[in-house]
């Protein structure tokens, strides 16, 4: 089975649409790659596949091989020079990154996917069984909102072919990252997703509160546009880890609109601390545009 080449599987879930699951998936994938891990991204949001846009590879097409589909390469394994990283070390290994999405298969990007449940279920199963992943350390699965046919088919197939504990011969279903926005209307829907994980036995790795404020492009001040702290309170109520808050950053949007992969550029800040001094070059999937990842206080 193609998943035999996968070491760890992480789901990115949310009970609410439009909270930024795909942007979180993209940043997780690029960050893991920057740390030297080989990463795959599977986009099973069939009616709104946006992962190709986030990676700037919308025009790419999957190739068919005798055993199944070959995922699209985002970038190959490479070494960034110490000069580019502004470090004294010899360099940094960037892990290979590849992805699979229905967006690569549709004849036109604007084509609507009007499928009933059985066809969606079959497509999800095909993505899990017919994609020829290379050896990857992490497979991130970007899911649609809610707890629909796609989720049920996804978990049925994964639970048959993976292990929920580290196992030498089976892919490890590590768990799920749950994404929300801070306002109450989003929290109420995302709570259903946490209950879904509990009922299906999927470990929740943590909650990310996205769009938790607005970063001013002039002064970098973060203003809480909606409410504040809803994701953290929800995580505490469900006794799961809270991974942090991510505000709206116009620089992030600009990178995506330009077709540039938003990979922790120089100036990335987490809770006021610089967490990446690297102006990652084009071969790493980014440019030296200043962009910030902030925690709103």
From Swiss-Prot:
The Swiss-Prot or TrEMBL record lists the needed cofactor(s) as: [4Fe-4S] cluster
Which keywords appear in this protein's UniProt record, sorted alphabetically? Answer: 4Fe-4S, ATP-binding, Cytoplasm, Iron, Iron-sulfur, Metal-binding, Nucleotide-binding
Q: Which residues bind ATP?
A: 15-22
Query: Annotated Gene Ontology MF terms?
Result: 4 iron, 4 sulfur cluster binding; ATP binding; ATP-dependent FeS chaperone activity; iron-sulfur cluster binding; metal ion binding
- Binding positions ([4Fe-4S] cluster): 216, 219
A GO biological process held by the record: iron-sulfur cluster assembly
The residues that cross the membrane are none
The record's free-text note on cofactor binding:
Binds 4 [4Fe-4S] clusters per heterotetramer. Contains two stable clusters in the N-termini of NBP35 and two labile, bridging clusters between subunits of the NBP35-CFD1 heterotetramer.
UniProt entry tagged with the keyword Hydrolase? no
Where it sits in the cell: the answer is: Cytoplasm
Q: Would you tell me the Gene Ontology cellular component terms?
A: cytosol
Give the matching Pfam families: ParA
SUPFAM superfamilies linked: P-loop containing nucleoside triphosphate hydrolases
Keyword set includes Iron-sulfur: yes
Function (record text): Component of the cytosolic iron-sulfur (Fe/S) protein assembly (CIA) machinery. Required for maturation of extramitochondrial Fe-S proteins. The NBP35-CFD1 heterotetramer forms a Fe-S scaffold complex, mediating the de novo assembly of an Fe-S cluster and its transfer to target apoproteins.
Describe the family membership recorded for this protein in Swiss-Prot or TrEMBL.
Belongs to the Mrp/NBP35 ATP-binding proteins family. NUBP2/CFD1 subfamily.
Question: What does the subunit comment say?
Answer: Heterotetramer of 2 NBP35 and 2 CFD1 chains.
Protein name as catalogued: Cytosolic Fe-S cluster assembly factor CFD1
Q: Which organism is it from?
A: Phaeosphaeria nodorum (strain SN15 / ATCC MYA-4574 / FGSC 10173) (Glume blotch fungus)
